[in-house]
Amino acid sequence: MSVDEEVNLDEVIDRILPIMNDVARVDTPIRINREGALGVLDADRATALVMVVTELVQNAIEHAFEPSAKQGCVTIRAERSARWLDVVVHDDGRGLPDGFSLEKSDRLGLQIVRTLVTAELDGSLGMHEVPGGGTDVVLRVPLGRRSSARVPQ
């Protein structure tokens, strides 16, 4: 892949998501959905973003749900404007552990996500519990000159 090549993120994510449940090896059936369009990015930024989204989904599958849960849902929501790509990875699981801090987490996966979002994508990352249960991980990535602002049809 050349640096100038563009990648349709929706196609890539849609191909990866069905595989993730099989790899997770959890007893709880998890439904994974994508809402909205991630669109097209240059290859370097697309690679970093795909790594971030897959790590966040995998983290939700492995940690969000009680072993006794009958089912769970992880949803990737994307909203794209001319300047920003906003992505929320939402789960309807048990929420965050007491005292959890994204900035202080020593989990390797979250450290990698934090580094990719802030250093590679020049974006921001946040994580919070959802009233009624679950967690939202929110990332905002600027769409620079090299990022296509178009959303494929």
Feature names for model-found ranges:
Residues 84-111:
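Glycine-rich/acidic phosphate-handling loop/turn and adjacent ATP-lid/helix
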Residues 7, 25-55, 62-73, 100:
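Conserved short strand/loop->alpha-helix "switch" segment adjacent to the catalytic nucleotide/phosphoryl-transfer site
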Residues 121-129:
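Glycine-rich ATP-binding loops of the HATPase_c
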Residues 112-122:
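Conserved glycine-/histidine-rich ATP-lid loop and adjacent helix of the Bergerat-fold HATPase_c
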Residues 71-83:
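Short beta-strand/loop element within the Bergerat-fold HATPase_c
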Residues 3-23:
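Short beta-to-alpha transition helix within the HATPase_c
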Residues 30, 83-87, 135:
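Short beta-strand element(s) in the Bergerat
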Residues 131-133, 138-153:
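C-terminal end segment of the histidine kinase catalytic
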